[in-house]
Amino acid sequence: MSLSLALFAKAPVPGQTKTRLQGALGQSGAVAAHCQLVEHALTEISRLKGMRTELWMSEQHPVAEAWSERFAIPLRLQQGVDLGARMHHALQQQLSCGASFAFVMGCDCPTLDMRYLDWAASQSAQADVIIAPAQDGGYGLIGLAQPQAHLFTGMPWGSDSVYAQTLLRAELSGLKVVTGAEIWDVDRPEDWTRYQRLFGCQGRP
């Protein structure tokens, strides 16, 4: 199978990136934390074998260009009015460019490591949908064998029901869903502290 993965990331713009961390870290600290998480994700996906990887940014930014060069990863721009539209577009683009199974992954889920992604790749031949549920009720990774616009439209992004609603829609459509182990994302100050503790980061970013 031809597999493809789009890593989604926001441009590191002060005041617009990791806003829930700003109270604890300040604007510059939140941006630095975001960059560290993106680089963690890029390091993990760069270790994958047999899967095309792309970095999909929210907007053009010099740091993104530097990441593209440093990690030898193609750079793309997200398109769409909301997160669902942007994910659907990225999945559709990957599938239309020859991928037999395509993934979209968030950049702030540190436990989506090479082993997890290798597992997801191993399930792609027997699934219509692969999803990595997050502790906050969302998900950090979704993969599809075919475009499924209904999984992304009218979804309450940012709520704790995104995963449950996505799963329900997929099952009602008769899609075969494979669910991975629960993951967590870095969104709040306590998540950042957890990341620092588990991944050996010390002090402020």
Language-model features and meaning:
Residues 32-51:
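A short, N-terminal amphipathic alpha-helix
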